[in-house]
Amino acid sequence: MSEIINTDSAAKPLGAYPHARRVGNLLFLSGIGSRNAKDNTIPGLELDAEGNIIKYDIEAETLQVFANVKAVLEASGSSWDKIVDVTVFLTNMKKDFPVYNKIYAEYFTSVQA
C-alpha cells in the first residue's frame, strides 16, 4: 500500500496523479514541472496568441522546478539531501544543458563526480 502526498506549495499536478507517493521508506515524486503554485504561470515563458512558445528562460524554469521539488519533499517530511536519482527532460540540449547543469551543480554539491 502507498501513501499519497500532495501539497499546495507546488503547482497542482496536471494529470490524475499525486505530487508524490511513499511506499515503505521510499518516496517517488511524479513529474514536477516549472509552474508556479501561486498563479500557475511558468516563469520566463512567453507564448503567442496561438499558444506557441516565443521564448523561454531555462534558468527561471529550472529554479522553479527545484523550488517545486523542495516543496514536495518538505510536504512529505523528506529533504533535498535525500534525493538519489533525477530524470530531466530539456527542450534544447545544446542551448539548455549548460545553464541547467550549472544550477544543478549548485544544488547538488554533495554528489559531484
Q: Can you name each region flagged by the protein language model?
A:
Residues S2-A113:
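Short, polar/acidic, helix-capping and beta-turn segments at strand->helix junctions
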